[in-house]
Amino acid sequence: MTQKAIYPGTFDPFTNGHLDVLERALNIFQEVVVVIADNSQKQTLFSVEERLSMIREIIEDYPAVSVEVLHDGLLADYARQKGARAIVRGVRQVKDFEYEFQISLLNRHLYPEVTTVFLMPNVKYTYVASSIIKEVAMLGGDVSKFVHPSVLKSLHGKLDESKQHKPNNI
């Protein structure tokens, strides 16, 4: 059994699909570090601090899981620094795999000792993506089956906040 893996992502927000992949990773690895990518090229609904706080609350009952932020740099370098020999990636569809496969080859080139492990979520989460969750929530849909209660509360808070800042169109 490989000791440590990292599970990187934007996690904006962290969904039950992410949690499902994390739990599957814990069946393989003794320790998993959830790594929040602070990617300045991606526009996120939640700040890094908000995502960190939400994930910490979700993983508090998982002693083998920690969460950290990768502000800058390459994921392969980060994995090497942390002594991780595996990168966990959730793959929902073929389209995800094609992209992730290319990234995994690059990571292996940069850090030959690292292996990317692709995990499929439970079938009920195969269509769940953070972007879809945000869109459905913004349109008033119920996303409670797809996110942790604390994420749902934060999501509603963010949406209420954005409604208050929008000018009324008459």
From Swiss-Prot:
EC number: 2.7.7.3
One term of GO molecular function: ATP binding
Record pathway: Cofactor biosynthesis; coenzyme A biosynthesis; CoA from (R)-pantothenate: step 4/5
Leading EC class: transferase
GO cellular component terms listed in the entry, alphabetical order: cytoplasm
Family classification: Belongs to the bacterial CoaD family.
Protein name: Phosphopantetheine adenylyltransferase
